[in-house]
Amino acid sequence: MSSVKQSAQAATSDVVDTAKNATAETVTAATDFLHTPAVRAALPFINGGLSGMVATTVIQPIDMIKVRIQLAGEGKAGGPKPTPLGVTRDIIASGKAMDLYTGLSAGLLRQAVYTTARIGCFDTFMSRLSARAKEKGQSVGFKERASAGLAAGGLAAMIGNPADLALIRMQSDGLKPVAERKNYKSVIDALGGIARNEGVAALWAGAAPTVVRAMALNFGQLAFFSEAKAQLKARTQWSSKVQTLSASAIAGFFASFFSLPFDFVKTRLQKQTRGPDGKLPYNGMVDCFAKVAKQEGVFRFYRGFGTYYVRIAPHAMVTLLVADYLGWLTK
């Protein structure tokens, strides 16, 4: 009986050891895979895209409200000022609560393209700048961070402009008379319809302010996030999580301040369609700036700053927090 018990214990021990070895081999294999050159190069882009898509899913209703506020009172200096609550009430009253998520498919595609490229390029640029600075016995400063943010934002915005355009068209479609609405079913439907009816080049309508907005946004978001985090780490005893959240909020404010005028113009240009006379309301970014300033006043560019910040800051916080977490998981 004793020998049978010993045999059973030995067999159990062998099974446990085998399971441990298999688990260790699996973890090692996964770790080795994550550290292959191709995967290491791709991870910043993958993590960036995933983090942006998570943030967009959370923030989409606020983005919808922001766009409607920017399009309200076009061409008029006076009139009632729309409020976030009023816009929300109007959207729900004209349809259903889920209408606040109109354009989500376009928003997710935009993040899959834009944020993947933006954060991926920024991380790649920063890695190279850090390596170069290390060789010289120096550290990466604010100027280098800002340059990396500007370059990454501009490049990513140009690539992601079609998805951005589709998002604005889907979100503004409900403002048109019922007979003139396109009733896009998805981002693919929107992109296909725009390309067929207006030409492929129309997918890059508003590209100039989109690029400038992205550069301004990244200058505020990525550069100030890195700088704020470095300053908070040096000057406070806060936990890493509190420092990250605080740096995200600071970065979101500067990102909003620098980018809102360009976001406003981008929305107007991407929403516009040709009238009965075949002409567009605006001829380009400069013309849009000039007409809005003359007809509606310069402060119109900052209308809805609070809503924009509430959209930008949490989006920045969620994006950067998820990106940091994914970076920690895959380091």
Swiss-Prot record:
GO CC list: mitochondrial inner membrane
Subcellular location as annotated: Mitochondrion inner membrane
Transmembrane stretches, start-end: 42-62, 103-121, 148-168, 199-219, 245-265, 309-329
Superkingdom of this protein's organism: Eukaryota
InterPro entries according to UniProt: Mit_carrier (IPR002067), Mito_Metabolite_Transporter (IPR050391), Mitochondrial_sb/sol_carrier (IPR018108), Mt_carrier_dom_sf (IPR023395)
Keyword Cytoplasm among record annotations: no
Signal peptide coordinates: none
Membrane topology: Multi-pass membrane protein
One Pfam family recorded for the sequence: Mito_carr
Gene3D superfamilies xrefs: Mitochondrial carrier domain
Solcar repeat residues: 39-128, 140-231, 239-329
Role of this protein: Catalyzes the transport of 2-oxoglutarate across the inner mitochondrial membrane.
The family this protein is said to belong to: Belongs to the mitochondrial carrier (TC 2.A.29) family.
PANTHER family to which the protein is assigned, alphabetical: MITOCHONDRIAL DICARBOXYLATE CARRIER-RELATED
Protein name: Putative mitochondrial 2-oxoglutarate/malate carrier protein
Taxonomic lineage of the native organism: Eukaryota, Fungi, Dikarya, Ascomycota, Pezizomycotina
